[in-house]
């Protein structure tokens, strides 16, 4: 797909405003030449002031050019989104809320209720933030804010998914250490994405995946205390999230770009991973009843 961004998008009112400030000619589609006032008795001082004013006006035009181009690029990207972008997460958000309420209400202990509530809340936040960002038509500034929230929510869901499994299956130092690693890593990841919003995918996608596999360090503890089925669901959910991260990073496969592209494949895998973890947490929770 080719996205053509024009440079001649100034409105008549903007051009009139530039000419009112002394711009009379056009070069390459933008008004660049200026009339310089006679310095008169002020001599060189007046000429310097005129040059400074002209430079300021040229800078203003350049800023407006950049804003125009960014706006046009953003609009083109919005138009190029697959038609199903965001709908999977939009549909999953209310389902995750209902499923979370059921899980919390059936949890027999305060620890299981806490873990289930954190898991459900982080999932609802992620799916809601993702759907809001992808389904709306936002200004570039608003889209940047929503993107930060969306990416931060991924870290929260990783830590939120660890929490109930850790509270249910681990104890002692292993429980404390894994919770600190999960939530400390999530906090660091959120700070990283908020500060470096333009980081390339190949930089931040492995960070998500690495944090998602911290549990491997505690594999013996999970197998020692947890039913095999529960640990299998934990691992399967992690694999699905990992496959989703790989698809997101590589932008492949991209089956139907106009309807269901690589990003929709990524979203589908995240929904499947959430459902898998939900089943694992449910099995572990109901086993305590």
What spans do the regions from the language model cover?
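Aromatic (phenylalanine/tyrosine) cluster motif
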Residues: 7-10, 23
């Amino acid at each position: 797909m080719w996205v053509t961004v024009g440079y001649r998008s100034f409105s008549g009112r903007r051009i009139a405003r530039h000419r009112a400030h002394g711009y009379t000619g056009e070069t390459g589609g933008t008004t660049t030449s200026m009339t310089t006032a006679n310095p008169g008795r002020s001599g060189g001082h007046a000429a310097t002031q005129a040059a400074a004013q002209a430079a300021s006006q040229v800078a203003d035009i350049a800023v407006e050019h950049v804003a125009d181009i960014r706006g046009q690029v953003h609009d083109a990207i919005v138009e190029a989104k697959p038609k199903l972008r965001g709908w999977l997460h939009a549909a999953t958000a209310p389902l995750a809320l209902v499923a979370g309420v059921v899980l919390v209400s059936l949890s027999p202990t305060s620890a299981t209720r806490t873990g289930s509530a954190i898991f459900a809340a982080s999932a609802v936040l992620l799916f809601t933030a993702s759907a809001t960002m992808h389904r709306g038509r936002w200004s570039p500034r608003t889209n940047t804010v929503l993107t930060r929230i969306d990416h931060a929510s991924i870290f929260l869901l990783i830590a939120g998914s660890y929490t109930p499994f850790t509270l249910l299956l681990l104890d002692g130092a292993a429980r404390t250490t894994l919770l600190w690693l999960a939530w400390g890593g999530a906090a660091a990841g959120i700070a990283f994405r908020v500060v470096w919003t333009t980081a390339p995918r190949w930089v931040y996608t492995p960070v998500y995946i690495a944090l998602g596999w911290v549990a491997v360090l505690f594999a013996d503890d999970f197998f020692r205390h947890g039913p095999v089925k529960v640990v299998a669901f934990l691992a399967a959910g992690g694999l699905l999230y990992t496959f989703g991260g790989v698809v997101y990073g590589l932008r492949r496969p991209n089956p139907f770009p106009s309807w269901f592209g690589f990003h929709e494949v990524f979203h589908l895998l995240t929904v499947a991973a959430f459902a898998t973890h939900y089943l694992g947490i449910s099995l572990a929770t109901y086993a305590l009843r």
